[in-house]
Structure formats: structure tokens, C-alpha cells
């Protein structure tokens, strides 16, 4: 931000992240576009379980108690569907918005995503932000 360049900041943003992020955005006079990836919670939960069970998933992203796991330690049970959804809602992951436009993308079916349309929406939002920054009223 100090360089004044556009950038992408990717994270599972949640309510606890909002105030510190807003302070940074204000300090550096940035407006952020929030891109919320959501969809049918059941389908997302199923993908979550598959990803966590896969060999390519680093165990540090799966284990919430102690990593590396202690020898002989029983495997941690995966979150239930209800715990998964409650976590999303309680942490504000589906409602998080920074200080600018918010685009909600349904990722239930990846094949149905309109990627070119999404890129156009992002470009329009970015251009509107840049135009507002250049306006004499600012």
C-alpha cells in the first residue's frame, strides 16, 4: 500500500479482521473490492472434507490442536456440517465487506462460473474507484 500500487490480498476474511484492515485502508487512502466466494454450504462442506482428507493438503491446515501431531495421538474428528456452517456465520466469513464494493460469487458449481463476466465486474469496480480518486472533489 505504501507504494500506491493496486494489489490483491487473499484471505478467509472474517469479522475479527475488519477493523485492522479498515485502519490500513484508511491510512493509505485505499478502497478495497471485497470478493466473497460462497455457495451452497452443503456442497462447499463436501469439498472441504475431500480437500482435508487429500494427501496434498498440508496437515498444519487440518489439525487445530497440535502440529506436528504427537505420535499415538488419535486423529482429530472432522467438523460436522453444523459446526462448519456455524463457523462461517459466527466469524462473518459470508458477510465480510471492507470499505468498497462487494461482489458475491456463487462457487457451488465451478462449471457454472462466468469468469469473463466476473473479470469485467472487477475491472468496472476498480475503474470506478480509480476515477473517484482522480476526481477533483476528493
Language model features by range: what are they?
Residues 47-52, 119-123:
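Short, surface-exposed amphipathic charged segments that create phosphate/polyanion-binding patches used
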Residues 54-116, 137:
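Small-molecule kinase domains that catalyze NTP-dependent phosphoryl transfer to phosphate-bearing small molecules
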Residues 14-15, 41-42, 112:
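Alpha-helix N-cap/helix-start and coil->helix boundary motif
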Residues 1-38:
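Glycine-rich phosphate-binding loop used to anchor ATP phosphates in small-molecule kinases
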Residues 112, 119, 125-131:
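C-terminal alpha-helical "lid" subdomain
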Residues 18-20, 46, 114-115:
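Short glycine-/acidic-enriched loop or helix-start segments at secondary-structure transitions
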Amino acid at each position: 500500500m505504501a507504494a500506491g500500487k493496486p494489489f490483491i490480498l487473499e484471505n478467509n476474511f472474517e469479522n475479527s479482521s475488519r477493523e485492522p484492515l479498515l485502519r490500513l485502508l484508511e491510512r493509505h487512502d485505499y478502497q478495497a473490492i471485497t470478493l466473497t466466494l460462497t455457495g451452497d454450504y452443503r456442497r462447499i462442506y463436501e469439498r472441504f472434507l475431500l480437500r482435508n482428507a487429500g494427501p496434498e493438503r498440508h496437515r498444519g491446515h487440518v489439525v487445530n490442536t497440535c502440529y506436528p501431531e504427537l505420535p499415538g495421538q488419535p486423529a482429530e474428528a472432522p467438523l460436522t456440517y453444523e459446526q462448519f456452517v456455524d463457523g462461517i456465520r459466527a466469524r462473518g466469513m459470508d458477510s465480510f465487506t471492507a470499505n468498497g464494493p462487494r461482489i458475491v460469487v456463487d462457487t457451488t458449481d465451478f462449471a457454472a462460473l462466468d469468469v469473463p463476466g466476473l473479470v469485467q465486474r472487477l475491472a468496472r469496480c476498480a475503474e470506478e474507484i480509480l476515477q473517484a480518486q482522480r476526481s477533483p472533489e476528493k
